[in-house]
Design a protein with these regions (language model features):
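Feature of multi-pass inner-membrane transport and sensor proteins
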Residues: 1-22, 384-388, 406-425
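Alpha-helical membrane-protein architecture signal
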Residues: 3-8, 12, 19, 280-290, ...
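Short, strongly hydrophobic transmembrane alpha-helices
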Residues: 15-41
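Alpha-helical transmembrane segments of integral membrane proteins
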Residues: 21-31, 295-315, 352-360, 391-392, ...
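Sec-dependent signal peptide cleavage junction
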Residues: 36-50, 317-320, 373, 407-415
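Basic-flanked hydrophobic alpha-helices used for secretion and membrane insertion
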Residues: 40-298
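Short helix-loop junctions at transmembrane helix boundaries
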Residues: 284, 288-291, 340-344, 353-419
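Interfacial "coupling" helices/loops that link adjacent transmembrane helices in transporter permeases
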Residues: 309-351
Length: 425
């Protein structure tokens, strides 16, 4: 307790000097913290994240062609099966789609179309309302079908999750908001009726229980809403739904061998020119190429600042110990053991390191967060890179405790206790 009290007294003895040392260390640590956070957030593997964190999404480019006769179900069951049979593939999820109309009715359809025209159209809804009422086939939209796993993922992202059984049974659906200024409360609970585009007599009514802003679930974006339902319900309702896209997840993330095998399947397919894909690996490669030497430059800046901060601390503490040689020698002469003396110096170092990190993790983190959000155009969640942070904590505490200890060990060799008290060289 006495040693701890002496360390604290020395730490608070010269507030101005202590503040300068703490701020110097905290500034270096804060810049380090800021740079490693930015580098981690902009790393290719952090930026790149396909929907559901899949490794590849294969798209059927014919699915959204304007003329229905030009659309072909090229992502058929046999092709998807060949993907599933690949040893490196862990999950495959296909999204199906059918073109629909949403017949006019005075409640939800009317509200939706009014808002759609107000938001996106240059002409008033009143000018085209009659056409919509009498010829809904001129206002096509999409019915999207997703499997149970994709539903679970989507449902977890909703502000108001929906009943799974209602969704799978076909009682409930989710609607894509399409950027309209309609709240969940405006939409949820209303009924929406859709009819097959090629057969207006075949219709189905859903209760809207959820609303999403995720544009992954879109095909032909028409004026009426895009409806998302269970794929089994869509298959029962529609005559020939088309597979719009297939997402693939590998057992091993960023597995280039598996990806090459999938791409080989695409190239061998007779419809190769009608496929497109999004690849996490390709996106990461593009980002790394675009970033060039940015990570190395950032690390270089971090090392320079760390060196400056450490040298500043060393210089300050060496001078501090030198100026206290007489005081420390007197303590040693009246019975303080070398172990106790070194323990006191170590505690002082811990106080400096702890104080610097306190400033870094409050003020420094606040500044880092503000800078991060100002440049966060991709909407990546703020997170602290734990390993670089723990590394910096370890190094800073090691330096802050070892510098005073080594300084004392070197300086005490300059003479006996009596000589040091008298100030003899």
């Amino acid at each position: 307790k006495v040693i701890a009290r002496l360390s604290l007294e020395q730490f608070t003895k010269d507030n101005k000097r202590t503040a300068v040392v703490l701020l110097s260390l905290a500034a270096s640590l804060s810049v380090y913290f800021c740079i490693v956070t930015m580098l981690d957030s902009q790393a290719a593997r952090t930026i790149v994240s396909n929907y559901m964190d899949t490794d590849m999404v294969i798209k059927n480019d014919t699915a959204c062609k304007e003329k229905s006769e030009d659309r072909r179900d090229i992502l058929d069951d046999s092709f998807v099966k060949s993907i599933k049979e690949n040893a490196g593939v862990s999950e495959v999820h296909s999204m199906i789609f059918a073109e629909i109309t949403v017949p006019w009715e005075p409640d939800f359809a009317e509200m939706w179309m009014k808002e759609f025209y107000a938001k996106w159209m240059s002409i008033p809804y009143s000018k085209e309302k009659d056409e919509y009422q009498n010829h809904p086939e001129n206002f096509g939209s999409s019915l999207i079908g997703i499997d149970e796993q994709e539903f679970d993922y989507l449902n977890n992202s909703l502000t108001h999750p929906i009943n799974k059984e209602d969704f799978l049974s076909g009682k409930a659906c989710i609607v894509y908001r399409n950027g309209l200024d309609l709240s969940d409360a405006d939409i949820i609970g209303k009924n929406v009726t859709c009819a097959l585009y090629e057969d207006q007599q075949t219709a189905k009514t859903f209760t809207i229980e959820g609303v999403t802003d995720e544009n992954y679930y879109t095909a032909l974006l028409g004026y009426p809403p895009t409806i998302i339902a269970s794929d089994q319900v869509v298959k029962t309702f529609a005559n020939h739904p088309i597979t719009l896209k297939t997402s693939i997840k590998y057992h091993k993330e960023y597995d280039r061998d598996t990806e090459q095998e999938i791409l080989a399947l695409l190239e061998k397919n007779d419809n190769a020119k009608d496929f497109s894909w999004e690849s996490k690996i390709e996106d990461a490669d593009e980002i790394e190429k675009a970033q060039g030497n940015m990570p190395q430059v950032g690390i270089g800046i971090v090392l320079i600042l760390a060196f400056i901060g450490i040298m500043n601390y060393m210089n300050t503490f060496v001078v501090n110990v030198q100026s206290r040689m007489t005081e420390l020698s007197v303590m040693e002469s009246i019975g303080m053991t070398p172990k106790q003396l070194l323990g006191m110096l170590v505690r002082e170092g811990v106080l400096y390191a702890g104080g610097a990190w306190l400033v870094t993790l409050t003020v420094g983190m606040g500044v880092t967060y503000l800078l991060y959000e100002s440049m966060n155009y991709r909407g990546i969640a703020f997170s602290v890179p734990l390993l670089p942070l723990l590394f910096a904590v370890g190094i800073s505490f090691l330096v802050c405790t070892m510098v005073p200890v080594l300084t004392w060990i070197i300086l005490e060799k300059n003479g006996t206790v009596v000589e040091r008290i008298k100030g003899v060289e």
